[in-house]
C-alpha cells in the first residue's frame, strides 16, 4: 500500500513544459476519472498551478507501480512522449510524499516562500477531487493535516508577513526601478489569477496605464 506524489515544479522544469502538462480546471474532473480508471481504483488529487503540476495518490499496489501508472497517465493524457517530460519529474513515496505535501501547502516549496495563494490552490484541488469522489480516508486525512500544518506555520512564524506573492514582488521591483508608476504603461500577459493579482497590485500603486494581453478577448474584458 503506497502514498505517492509525482510531478514537476519551477525547481525542475521550464515554464514551457509546465504549460504543456497543465490541467485546466475544467478538465480536471475528467482527468481524475481517467486516472482512477487507469489505477483500477485507489484515490488521487491533481494539483495544477502555474508553478507546479502534481498528482498525489494512494493505492493498495506498491508505490513503485503506482508511480509508473501515474507517469503513463500524464504522458497519455497530454500526448507527450516520456522523453520530453519524465526527466523533469520527481517521485516521492511514503513519508517523503507526506513531507512534500506539507512543504508545498505551507508555501515552503513555493517560488516566493511565504506566499499565501498555494494554500487555497491545494484546498481547491482537494475539494475538486472530493467532489469527484476520488479521495479516500487516507488522502482525506493527509490533506486535512497538511492544511492544519500550513495554518500553524503561518500563525507561529512570520513567513507570510507583509505582501508576499509573485505579483506584489514584481510590482515592488518595478517601483524600485521607476520610483513612480503614474506616468508608466505596463503590459500584463494573461488574465488568470496571477494576472488579476498583478493588476490589483499595479492599481494600488497608481500605475498610469495598463495593457492586458490574453488569448481570449472575453476573459480579458471580464478582468478589465
Predicted regions and their residues:
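Solvent-exposed alpha-helical segments within well-ordered globular domains of core cellular machineries
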Residues: 33, 72, 99, 120-123, ...
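Glycine/serine-rich phosphate-binding loop and adjoining beta1-alpha1 elements at the start
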Residues: 84-182
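Gly/Ser/Thr-rich helix-start
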Residues: 8, 115, 193
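Glycine-rich phosphate/diphosphate-binding loop of Rossmann-like nucleotide-binding domains
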Residues: 171-224
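Short, well-ordered alpha-helical scaffold segments within catalytic/effector domains
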Residues: 25, 29, 164-171, 195-196
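A glycine-rich (often HGG/GG-containing) alpha/beta subdomain
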Residues: 1-110
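Active-site-proximal beta-alpha loop/turn segments in soluble metabolic enzymes
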Residues: 66, 156, 202
Amino acid at each position: 500500500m503506497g502514498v505517492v506524489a509525482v510531478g514537476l515544479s519551477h525547481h525542475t522544469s521550464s515554464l514551457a513544459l509546465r504549460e504543456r502538462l497543465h490541467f485546466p480546471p475544467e478538465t480536471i474532473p475528467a482527468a481524475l476519472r481517467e486516472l482512477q480508471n487507469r489505477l483500477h481504483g485507489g484515490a488521487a488529487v491533481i494539483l495544477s498551478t502555474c508553478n507546479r503540476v502534481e498528482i498525489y495518490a494512494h493505492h493498495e499496489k506498491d508505490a513503485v507501480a503506482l508511480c509508473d501508472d501515474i507517469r503513463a497517465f500524464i504522458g497519455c493524457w497530454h500526448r507527450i512522449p516520456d522523453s520530453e517530460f519524465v526527466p523533469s519529474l520527481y517521485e516521492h513515496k511514503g513519508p517523503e510524499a507526506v513531507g512534500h505535501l506539507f512543504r508545498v501547502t505551507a508555501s515552503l516549496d513555493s517560488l516566493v516562500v511565504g506566499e499565501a495563494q498555494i494554500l487555497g490552490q491545494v484546498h481547491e484541488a482537494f475539494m475538486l477531487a472530493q467532489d469527484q469522489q476520488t479521495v479516500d480516508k487516507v488522502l482525506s486525512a493527509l490533506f486535512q493535516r497538511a492544511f492544519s500544518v500550513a495554518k500553524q506555520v503561518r500563525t507561529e512564524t512570520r513567513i507570510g508577513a507583509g505582501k508576499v506573492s509573485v505579483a506584489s514582488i514584481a510590482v515592488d521591483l518595478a517601483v524600485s526601478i521607476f520610483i513612480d508608476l503614474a506616468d508608466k504603461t505596463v503590459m500584463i500577459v494573461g488574465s488568470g489569477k496571477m494576472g488579476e493579482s498583478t493588476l490589483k497590485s499595479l492599481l494600488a500603486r497608481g500605475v498610469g496605464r495598463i495593457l492586458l494581453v490574453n488569448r481570449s478577448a472575453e476573459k480579458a474584458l471580464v478582468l478589465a
